[in-house]
Regions:
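Helix-loop-helix hairpins and the membrane-proximal interhelical loops
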Residues: 1-50, 61-70, 227-228
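Helix-loop-helix junctions within the multi-pass membrane cores of secondary transporters/permeases
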Residues: 2-3, 74-164
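Residue-level signature of the transmembrane alpha-helical core
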Residues: 16, 23, 44, 48-49, ...
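Transmembrane helix boundary and interhelical junction motifs in multipass membrane proteins
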Residues: 24, 28, 41, 52-59, ...
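Residues that define the loop-to-transmembrane-helix transition and helix capping
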Residues: 41, 70, 100, 128-129, ...
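Membrane-embedded alpha-helical modules
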Residues: 128-210, 221
């Protein structure tokens, strides 16, 4: 327990920016859910067991349109397909996490993946507890935001337009932090180039998964050149 608390204290400051973003986005999700006729219990269930922001927002629309369960599953898999790339890149760090592994796989969101690649535990701090703490904290923030939003939304109405930009802003900040911490920026510029080209060719609806696949292939094929 002492080791876990030590790792938890080390991890917490790194998650504050995610707390702010997840609080706002979680509240937006909770409010939208209530506006479509669902209550806080649905918000709690979805945030506990689905825990995928984009999928949860899409699910509101699908459920309201009385879509079949099969359609919901297919759309969810397509929307979250990018997580496969994240999981593959985290295999080495997750392999010794023991009983934590199933939860870490469940809790590997975009933001958690970014933090785990940006920060490492201090000397003397257990890495597996550090990884677990970041994952657990971020999940708690999302659940908390969803619950607050659903409870507040059941009593008040809000205009949530534009709130989705919060997470985009956080990603830009995380990218800049990682950019400043490294001296070799070839990977960063390669990622930007591939993303921009895919966005221009395939549009906002399809570019993300294609860009991620191309980035993984590029890193595999040109690893030595990029590390120089």
């Amino acid at each position: 327990m002492h080791e876990f608390l030590k790792a938890f204290r080390d991890a917490f400051p790194h998650t504050i920016s995610i707390f702010l973003g997840y609080l706002l986005m979680g509240m937006t999700f909770g409010m939208l859910l209530v506006q479509h006729g669902y209550d806080y219990k649905v918000a709690l269930f979805m945030s506990l067991f689905i825990y995928a922001g984009a999928v949860q927002f899409v699910a509101i629309t699908l459920l309201s349109a009385q879509a079949s369960l099969m359609n919901v599953v297919i759309v969810s898999l397509l929307v979250n397909a990018r997580q496969t790339c994240y999981a593959l890149s985290m295999l080495d760090r997750f392999k010794n996490t023991q009983w934590r592994l199933p939860y870490l796989a469940h809790a590997l969101t975009d933001e958690t993946f970014a933090l785990l690649n940006l920060y490492a535990p201090k000397e003397g701090v257990s890495e597996k507890d550090f990884i677990f703490s970041i994952s657990l904290l971020n999940h708690f923030y999302w659940i908390f935001g969803s619950l607050v939003g659903s409870l507040v939304g059941s009593h008040f109405s809000f205009d949530t337009q534009g709130m989705e930009f919060v997470m985009t802003a956080i990603f830009i900040v995380l990218f800049m932090e990682q950019y400043k911490r490294t001296t070799n920026h070839k990977n960063a510029w390669l990622g930007i180039f591939i993303a921009v080209v895919c966005l221009a060719l395939f549009g906002t609806e399809y570019f993300l998964l294609i860009a991620l696949v191309l980035m993984v292939l590029a890193l595999m094929l040109f690893r030595k050149q990029l590390e120089c």
